[in-house]
A protein has these predicted regions:
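Catalytic cores of the polymerase beta-like nucleotidyltransferase superfamily
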Residues: 1-307
Length: 307
């Protein structure tokens, strides 16, 4: 019976309108997780058993709120997601109909959805248990997948069968790593092993999705290291395979191997308070060509890297 700080009044008023019309509606996803962790949510996403046309009907009846129409909204309706503008907010919020996934097209790049009747069904399709919680307008947590317990125990766990989750959408593996390093929580053993076993699947993802997610990992402490240990980065960039075998001259690099050099470089980078994803990408690429230029110096016992 955990209770959290209720959402802002503008969100509560909208949720009340749905409840008054006989629908269930919840705050879902990251906002619930962040509130449990004592963090300020960046935004509030809602989920309901109302279908998009029913969402529009409810929203049209609430003064000051507007159901967003147009190409962007029509595209969203295909995903059972409605966009609604609310008073005093610049960004529209998303109200998604409870949904279940029937399969994927193009290596998840697009899910095929149908409406679900309950939040329990909706939660089954989410990536991680900590992102599969809901919250009522008065702050009561709804937790069908045990995300609250996992947060309290300090563990990142996939919803259901981790292999199935990652085959459905390989980006979920990188998201699991991101939340692990962001919150300093270890990944559950079964979930971690599923990432290692399925790391090759990330090669099916689009460059844009990879860029957005990996950049968020690299700016966090241990992010680079976990991408390497799980095999994700070597799959995406073969230059990062076998970096341990390349040895620097210790006079210049007392950390020794090229692998250790990157670990130490990212360790220092993540101490910078205002570090950026662009800076992380620059650091990632700064020595990427060394394996291709390496020559062994037999006398000195180290590699040289003359391009």
């Amino acid at each position: 019976n955990t209770e959290l700080t209720p959402p802002p009044a503008e969100i509560r008023n909208l949720m009340k309108a749905f409840e008054d019309n006989g629908y269930q509606i919840l705050v879902v996803g990251g906002a619930v997780r962040d509130l449990i962790l004592g963090l300020e949510p960046k935004d509030y996403d809602l989920a309901t058993n109302a279908k998009p046309d029913e969402v529009k009907e409810v929203v049209d009846g609430v003064k000051g709120y507007r159901y967003v129409l147009g190409p962007q909204a029509e595209k969203s309706v295909l995903n059972l997601t409605s966009l609604v503008t609310i008073p005093n907010e610049k960004e529209a919020i998303e109200i998604t109909t409870f949904r279940k996934e029937l399969g994927y097209a193009g290596g998840r790049t697009k899910g095929v959805f149908e409406p679900a009747d309950t939040f329990d069904e909706d939660a089954e399709r989410r990536d991680l248990t900590i992102n599969a919680m809901g919250m009522t307008a008065d702050g009561k947590v709804i937790d069908p997948q045990g995300g609250l317990e996992d947060l309290q125990n300090g563990v990142i766990r996939a919803v259901g069968d981790p292999t199935q989750r990652f085959v459905e959408d390989p980006l979920r593996m990188i998201r699991a790593i991101r939340f692990s390093v962001r919150f300093g929580l270890p990944i559950d053993k079964e979930t971690y092993q599923a990432i290692v076993s399925n790391a090759d699947l990330v090669s099916t993802l689009s460059g844009r999705r990879l860029r957005d997610e990996i950049g968020k990992v690299l700016v966090e402490p241990n992010g680079y290291q976990l991408l390497m240990e799980t095999g994700i980065l070597p799959v995406l960039m073969p230059e990062f395979r076998n970096m341990e075998q390349y040895q620097h001259k210790l006079d210049y690099h007392p950390e020794g191997s090229l692998y250790n050099h990157y670990i130490e470089a990212f360790k220092e980078f993540t101490k910078i308070p205002n570090r950026t994803e662009l800076g992380a990408w620059a650091l990632l690429f700064h020595d990427i060509a060394k394996p291709q230029t390496a020559e062994w110096n037999e006398e000195g016992g180290y590699h040289t890297f003359y391009g």
